Amino acid sequence: MLERPDWKGVNPYGMVYVRPGTVHIGNSDQDITGTFIQRPKSISISGFYMDDTEISNNEYRQFVFWVRDSIAHDLMGDYYADENGEERIDWEAPLDFSAPEVQDLYLETRFAGRKLYNANIFKYDYKTFDWDAAAADRGRSSPERFFEEHTIEVYPDTMVWIRDFAYSYNEPMARNYFWHPAYDNYPVVGVNWHMARAFGYWRTSLWNSVNEISTEEFRLPTEAEYEYAARGGREHAPYPWGGPYVRNAKGCLLANFKPGRGNYPEDGGQYTVPVDAYYPNDFGLYNMSGNVAEWTSTAFVENANSFIHDMNSDVHYEADEDDPEAWKRKVVRGGSWKDVSFYLQTGTRSYEFQDTTKSYVGFRNVLSLMGRSASDF
């Protein structure tokens, strides 16, 4: 067909290519009791791009500001009609945040002489397509039936620093972590699974708006993709750095975690550390273990390895609000700054509920490769 666009592949900024391969998922250490429930399994994973670091406060703040500005433009009536006659936000229109029309963005009460955002109105709307339902329908219904609309509050829950730790003074983190420049390059926390997924849809929309050819969506990694990437090509490696130890030859810790009872700061960070702290693994990925645990797209099922497919393995379920709580569990991987070393192992599984926010859970995005291999482009 003539006049087809020339596809030269993509190389997204801040992402590294994870080549396709085969990986032996499951516990790498001699966890006999755990093996009874979660049996090891060999699977194949397609190639993909992955953020080399966790999403930082600075990166997530771009999303929050985009939502803030879109609301401000809406309140100001800054629209124009495109070539199809549809209304679009006029992003070139100047914004005056002192104008009376946009004061709904702020709370009436000031704190320390500053205006405070009304975070409850910072909402992002997007649509998803239910591919499983559409495949099961076999074309009998209109595709419109399978689109689902979502409205998600995007402002991080800064109160997690207080709520997660009773009888503990963490108010300075609640006040400053998401906004102070000192924490710009630290991983964003206080985001639930829905917020992390919404960030991916916004990022995809932003990418496609400035590129002639649309790409695949930026999304959360599946559990299998995360484990494969964390291992860095090292088969049966218990940690991303390969060896069975959490300290190097000099006795220095190799990740940000809790090495002993009541011992948080030995690695140099009482809480989180910058997203590019410590050495990357052999794929070039930082902090795949430690710092913050990370959301995956996968639903948590205890014995998933006994029934998942051996190609691009995944368990996907869209839990509704009225579903049983157990159905709302999503796999988190990597362990965090407040966890012991067991949770840092590449084969260790854990979960959080999809609608909960934590001070120790963040995320990063992946992008599926289009084509056979990145080396083809």
Positions of the model-derived regions?
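Bacterial Sec-dependent N-terminal signal peptides
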Residues: 1-13, 229
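Short, P/G- and charge-enriched loop/turn segments at secondary-structure junctions
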Residues: 3-5, 37, 317-320, 349-354
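A short glycine-rich, aromatic-capped structural motif
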Residues: 9-176, 184-195, 290
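Functional-site microenvironments in short loops/helix caps that host divalent-cation chemistry
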Residues: 17-18, 24, 29, 127-346, ...
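A short local loop/turn or secondary-structure capping micro-motif enriched for an aromatic residue
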Residues: 33-35, 302-304, 353-354
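Short, surface-exposed beta-strand/loop micro-motifs that present aromatic residues
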Residues: 39-41, 282-284, 354
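Short, structured beta-strand segments at or near domain termini in extracellular proteins/domains
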Residues: 359-375
